[in-house]
Amino acid sequence: MSDKCGNCDCADSSQCVKKGNSIDIVETDKSYIEDVVMGVPAAESGGKCKCGTSCPCVNCTCD
């Protein structure tokens, strides 16, 4: 399920922010900053995560 974020399909699996693994691929400095900011609340949600701006899903639960 590397291309899915819970029940949501992500077009780009690198946009899925998972607990303990907030960044898979860094394209630009701006992208890096956005991923880090999103990774903090996602990790605090106890395993719940959300996809990045490139993905339509926002409240996905990661396995």
Swiss-Prot record:
GO molecular function per UniProt: copper ion binding; zinc ion binding
The keyword DNA-binding belongs to this UniProt entry's keyword annotation: no
Swiss-Prot/TrEMBL keywords: Metal-binding, Metal-thiolate cluster
GO biological process terms on file: cellular detoxification; intracellular copper ion homeostasis
InterPro entries: MT3
Task performed by this protein: Metallothioneins have a high content of cysteine residues that bind various heavy metals.
Family per similarity comment: Belongs to the metallothionein superfamily. Type 15 family.
Protein name, as recorded: Metallothionein-like protein type 3
